[in-house]
C-alpha cells in the first residue's frame, strides 16, 4: 500500500493494523474458502448491531457490550487497548451475543422492523417473547402463532387433545390457570408432567420449546386454546 502511494506521488498516511484474526481453534479465516462472510452471517440472522459491537472490542481489553450507535463505538475506540497476539473470532459467542441483543434492545427500535401483525406487537408481547427469539423472523413467527393464520392439525391425537380440553379449568384465565390445568390433568392420568407439558405446547403452538405456558395461555385466550384442542 505504501508503494502505491509512493508511485502516485501522494502523501503517505499514518497507517496501522490490528493483529491477525483466526477462528476459535487458531485456524486462519479466509474469504477464499468461505470460512466467514457478511453474507453468511446475514443468512444466520446475525444483527448488524450485535456484529459491530463484537468486532469493535474482540482482541482488546475492553468488554464486549451492545452499543447504541456507531458513534459510541468510535468514541470508545482505543488502539492501545488491543493485543498484539492473534485474535480469535468466536462464532458461538457471537450467536449467543446476538440472542442477548434481542433481550436488551429497545421496544420501539424493534417495533419499527415488524411488518406482519404489527398491531399485536405490544410492549407486553415483547416482554413475553424476547427471551425466546434470536431474529426478526422468529418474532414474526410468534406473532403468527398467537394472532395469525396458525395451522391447526385437527387429525392429530384427537383423544389426547379432547382429554386435555375437558381438564381445562372452568374459570377466567389468569396466571394461576396453567398450574390448575396441569393439576387437573395429572390427577386423572398416569403420565409424567414433562410429557404433558410437551404435548400441550405442541398442540397450542406447534413448537417443542418457547415461552412459559402460564403466560402463553393468557395471550392465546380460552377461545383459541379450545379451537386448537378440538
What are these regions (language model features)?
Residues 6-152, 205-230:
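Catalytic adenosine-cofactor/nucleotide-binding cores of aminoacyl-tRNA synthetases and other
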Amino acid at each position: 500500500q505504501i508503494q502505491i502511494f509512493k508511485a502516485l506521488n501522494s502523501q503517505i498516511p499514518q497507517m496501522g493494523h490490528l493483529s491477525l484474526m483466526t477462528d476459535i481453534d487458531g485456524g486462519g479465516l479466509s474469504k477464499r474458502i468461505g470460512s466467514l462472510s457478511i453474507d453468511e452471517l446475514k443468512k444466520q440472522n446475525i444483527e448488524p448491531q450485535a456484529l459491530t459491537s463484537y468486532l469493535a472490542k474482540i482482541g482488546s481489553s475492553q468488554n464486549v457490550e451492545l452499543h447504541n450507535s456507531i458513534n459510541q463505538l468510535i468514541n470508545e475506540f482505543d488502539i492501545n487497548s488491543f493485543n498484539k497476539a492473534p485474535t480469535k473470532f468466536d462464532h458461538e459467542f457471537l450467536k449467543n451475543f446476538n440472542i442477548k441483543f434481542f433481550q436488551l434492545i429497545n421496544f420501539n427500535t424493534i417495533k419499527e422492523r415488524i411488518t406482519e401483525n404489527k398491531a399485536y406487537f405490544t410492549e407486553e408481547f415483547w416482554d413475553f417473547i424476547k427471551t425466546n427469539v434470536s431474529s426478526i423472523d422468529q418474532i414474526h413467527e410468534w406473532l403468527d402463532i398467537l394472532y395469525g393464520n396458525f395451522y391447526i392439525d385437527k387429525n392429530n391425537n384427537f383423544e389426547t387433545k379432547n382429554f386435555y380440553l375437558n381438564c381445562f379449568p372452568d374459570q377466567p384465565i389468569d396466571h394461576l390457570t396453567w398450574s390448575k390445568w396441569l393439576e387437573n390433568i395429572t390427577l386423572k392420568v398416569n403420565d409424567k408432567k414433562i410429557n404433558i407439558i410437551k404435548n400441550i405446547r405442541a398442540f397450542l403452538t406447534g413448537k417443542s420449546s418457547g415461552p412459559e405456558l402460564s403466560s402463553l395461555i393468557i395471550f392465546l385466550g380460552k377461545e383459541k386454546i379450545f379451537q386448537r384442542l378440538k
